[in-house]
């Protein structure tokens, strides 16, 4: 079983999420809870930009197949030195989103509600929140 190190889980909680250029919390206030997933940098291994773009396009295709409403999103470190193109997904449950995260070799996926940001492990059952 693959488990994200504690330091990585803490870093995930510091992630700044935007959806279509807006703070994720504003979008949750307007549209309700949603998930944020990425295909960039699988298992935190930094890849070339072209490979990350290819993976992102594959993720977009999978979400289209699954029939979920989605919007473009970004996840970044607080200082902006680490930015990953992501997708905000509406109307999905935890199980299919975690499975999608595993499919794209992601340690975790983000759940955004009006008051809380949670990060759920994809390969093991852990959750952290702020």
Predicted features along the sequence, with ranges:
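Short, flexible, solvent-exposed loop/turn segments with mixed acidic/basic and small polar residues
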Residues: 71-81
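Short, flexible segments with low predicted structural confidence
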Residues: 35, 68-73
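N-terminal, charge-rich interaction modules
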Residues: 1-62
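Short, compact, well-ordered microdomains
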Residues: 82-86, 90-119
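Structural alpha-beta junctions
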Residues: 57-70, 105-107
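Short, low-order "capping/linker" segments at domain edges
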Residues: 86, 121-130
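A short secondary-structure junction signal
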Residues: 48-49, 99, 121-122
């Amino acid at each position: 079983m693959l488990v994200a190190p504690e330091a990585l889980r803490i870093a995930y909680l510091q992630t700044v999420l935007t959806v279509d250029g807006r703070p994720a919390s504003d979008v949750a206030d307007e549209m309700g809870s949603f998930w944020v997933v990425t295909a960039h940098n699988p298992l935190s291994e930094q890849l070339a930009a072209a490979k990350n773009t290819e993976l992102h396009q594959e993720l977009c295709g999978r979400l289209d197949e699954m029939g979920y409403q989605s919007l473009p999103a970004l996840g970044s470190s607080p200082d902006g030195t680490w930015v990953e193109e992501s997708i905000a997904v509406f109307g999905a449950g935890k199980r299919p989103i975690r499975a999608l995260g595993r499919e794209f070799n992601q340690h975790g996926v983000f759940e955004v509600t009006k008051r809380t940001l949670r990060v759920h492990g994809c390969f093991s059952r852990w959750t952290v929140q702020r």
